[in-house]
Amino acid sequence: MLVGARVLLGAPRGVGKTFTMLEEAKPLRDEGVDVVVAVVETHGRAGTAAALVGLEVVPRLTVEHRGVVLTEMDVAGVIVRRAPQLALVDELAHTNASRQRTEKRWQDVEAILDAGIDVMSTVNIQHIESLTDVVHKITGAPQRETIPDEVLRAAREIEVIDVTPVAAGALASGLVYPAERIDAALSNYFRLGNLTGLRELALLWLADEVDSALKNYRAEQGIDSTWETRERVVVALTGGPEGDSHPPGATHCRPCGRGELLAVHVTGQDGFAPPTRGLWRQRSLVESLGGSYHQVIGDDIALVEFARAANATQLVIGVSRRGRLARRCPVRGSVDGHRESGNIDVHIVNHAAAGGRFTLPRMAGGALTVKRRLSGLALTLILGPLITAVLVTFRSPDSITSDVLTYQVLVVLVALVGGIWPALLAAVLSGITLDYFLVEPLFTVTVDKPLHLFALALYITIAMMVSYVVDQAARRTRVARRSAAESELLATIAGSVLRGDGALQSLVSRTRKVWVEGCDCWMPRVRPITPTRPPGADGQTAADHAVICADGEPASDDRVVLVPVGERATLELHGADLDASERRLLAVIAAQIDAALEHEALSVTAREVGPLAETDRVRTALLSAVSHDLRRPFDGGNQKGGWLALHRDDPVCRRPGGAARDRRRKPAHLSVLVTDLLDVSRVQAGVLGVTVRQVDVEDVLPRALDELGVGPDQVVLDLDAAVGPVLADPGLLQRVLVNLLANALRFSPEGAVPTIDQSFGDTVQIRVTDHGPGIAADRRDDVFVPFQRLGDTDNSTGLGLGLALSKGFTVGMGGELDTEDTPGGGLTMVVTLPVASADADANADRPGGSRASL
């Protein structure tokens, strides 16, 4: 351990700790202290080298490490040959190149201290073992040389060499790094944010060291009063659902998230109660917030004693879950906690579990609850004897009227509280008691007199009338509460869907809180789940389904309700028994969940389509610009090539090897590519000009064949003379046929001649058939996408625009272009065009605009 050493702790590199160590050593030398420099790294800094002047430096050892000659501190020279009073050792976390004696420099310092020599050393904050990961996150620079915290904390004195981040100007002036490395350092390690973070980290680490020393002093002196030297928050955990809100609430009590967080769970006197799942969850939450978990045995006062022993400044407790009667009584634990806390601030955190959960009033059963009926029965059995005792005490012949009315009040009161059955019991008992104790002859029950029968009938009639009114009022009240609860639930659900973010989880959580113990929303990966085919049926396994979201945990019983959520998911509720009205309400919630799923799907699609649309817009603009800019020089090249071909006999224009012909052909090919690019941009912009008129396919096909240079033996034409003209643009139709026939010729094997035929009905179909390799069914839509070649590596045949343009041209003319399999193998391109009607002459040469898109 570094007992007796003085360590200068710096935050960033170049903060001046080595310079400070050398400057502090000079006054000690002047006072007569024997000081030597055991090892100091100047890193080429002029200021550090100048500070070394006048101090004795122990010569270093020369060692060879992996073929490189290095110098290390001569520990034996310092201890044996020199033996000073104070040795200056730089870079405490340094790893020795030659590990014959020790691996780390701090181990060499321990040896020097054991020899009775005082040591002053330096280290940077990034080399402390517990902080290396944090520094790596801040600066992005990993650290391989470290020193254990316990070794450094054992030092006699640790001083932070602090400097404000604005001192980065020293770096810019060349005091830390040479000029050629300044810009790189300022843009990486020495950014203002990095310097601020490292500075705070160094101060906090030293504050922990000071706090540890303070704890030891308080323990030695027996001080148990609170010293608010550092914010320390103690939070009580119960393991119940209300405890989940305590740790986050406690973090708000720490200024800027600093200070110490201690979570305490108080167990019973025996201490054998096993920890619950909720307590484990809360413990993990506390540890994720940077706190520590503790468990004590005792009662509420033990919590206060722990807080006082930990020198806590604040205590966070929660509101207990209590019934209505308990809410009217003082809470002994909370009151005692307030009284015994002393200088510790006590915070009471509220939570959702304190007020109970939102539930829908059940419509099944009678209008009055069992609790109310039992309350009415209790009133009959308690107030009846009390009233009888009072009336018997003051019994007289003139009090019979008041006696009857008193019992009548009891019957009405019982009817208001408990309904008809307790009221009927109260009426019968009141009549019998009145006749037995208060009507002559006493202590006998005789109901043969009309008056007695009338009184008993009156009691029963009044009880039934009042009970009926109470029952109807209770029924209407229940319906009103149910309607209000449903309205509140639907309003909350609708608001969750409108807010969008987190709507699905909010809906599922709300559903669980209303009805059940667990609520999962399952989405099948293969096929939709229906109530008749739950997960696990028909060979499906859990792997066939993906849980979109869940809330709570499935109940232990087998009660499961499956509700379809549109065609995309199923809502699965565990531990629920629902009546018809609740199922109707659940269907509305399922519709809202379906809307939330659709909203999320649309949001994902929008995020995916947005960049694609922007890319397509830029590409279209680029194609248009390039096409227009390149067309003019290509036209000029074509003209020059044509002139050379025309004057090929001129000796001045002769070129060897048919150069004039090649010179004309290549610009022509490039001109076709530019024209295709321009047409693609027009089709994508929806501004392709189309002139639709009557066109005879037999007139267009020869021109297409001539353009390709195809002879009669290279293609089979199977045209029906009965097929009439079609409505199309002749130029565009020719380009479509040229593109389709060119592809058919290119992909047809040798000896297999492409076929062009046509058929008609309501429309005319032109079929271009080849016997090539064909295209997989799942990739046929891709052939109509611009710049798609589907594995064609022949870059001399074009840019992959032919079929895309053919699709756009055909749709622009009011037709369709589809793909079919060729019997025996291959691909058939089918061009479908409308037949020219009898009145088509009236609309001949009708201009039109393309609505096609790629």
Swiss-Prot record:
The keyword Protease does not apply. The modification Phosphohistidine is found at H628. It is found in: Cell membrane. Keywords: ATP-binding, Cell membrane, Kinase, Membrane, Nucleotide-binding, Phosphoprotein, Transferase, Transmembrane, Transmembrane helix, Two-component regulatory system. The keyword tRNA processing does not apply. One of its GO terms (cellular component) is plasma membrane. PANTHER family: SENSOR PROTEIN KDPD. This is Sensor protein KdpD. The lineage of its organism: Bacteria, Bacillati, Actinomycetota, Actinomycetes, Micrococcales. The gene is kdpD.
